[in-house]
Amino acid sequence: MNKLIAIVGPNASGKSHIAVDLASALGGEIISADSRQVYRGMDLGSGKTPVSERKNVPHHLLDVVDAGEFFSMADFQKLAYEAADDILSRGKIPFLVGGTGLYVDSVTKGYLLSDVEPDLKYRDELEKLTTPELYDMLMEKVPDAAVDRFNRNRVMRMLEKLHDGDDIVPTASPRYDVLTIGIYREREELKRRIDERLTRREAEGMLEEVRGLREQGVSDEFLLKLGLEYRYITEYLTGVWSSEEEMLNELALAIKRFAKRQMTWFKRDQSIVWLNMNDKPFETALTLIKNFLEAE
């Protein structure tokens, strides 16, 4: 079975940077597993690794569709499989890197996904509920679901998948033999890094990025449904928040809550090898990967 390396962790943990270093050292290529990085023009808000920091490591599944277009987990899985198989065919190592738990699991666990038409009657019932009501409904079924409470589209899709069974998605035999490395920080350090990253991205033009998307015709509805940075900034630009400072403070709190939920989601998987970034884990991770690749 072909082998794949997954690097996961919460927002601001440093997983993308260590993944670039590892891929660079091992001749690998990175497949982004982030539900917002697939959109063109959504760079700062989604946290794409700048080209200048990619060390010439090829990155896949960035800028796949225009902002505003529909993109499903099934779309992601299909493209991720294609990218991984292409990387392997060229004798390279695929690194699946990201914090969107369902996207990661769809590849590493081999979810059975299809483009079957949704149950429109059930969808109509869901549409009648507010976003908080939908989120509470999901939490009753899957308390550790790593999803932004304001991302209405994703919450609804997860509820639809739960409608006909007990699991979010059925699992087939995985396509790849996978080593998953989890990257984490101590809680207070992660919170500090989230604050610093948000301040840096705001200074780099994150608000202007969202303004530009709106000027290009990307709907407020779409931006609001994406949650976190895009939701809060869109709310600020439409007068929901009284000041930029208030908005950024509330956004920072929301990102911290989401990072906690990401950790809860990933910690369900007992196969993940966790490494603390404070321990400078590059050499440890490199050894783990080399041993995994060399094993029969």
List PLM regions with ranges:
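Phosphate/pyrophosphate-binding catalytic cores of soluble transferases and nucleic-acid-acting enzymes
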Residues: 1-296
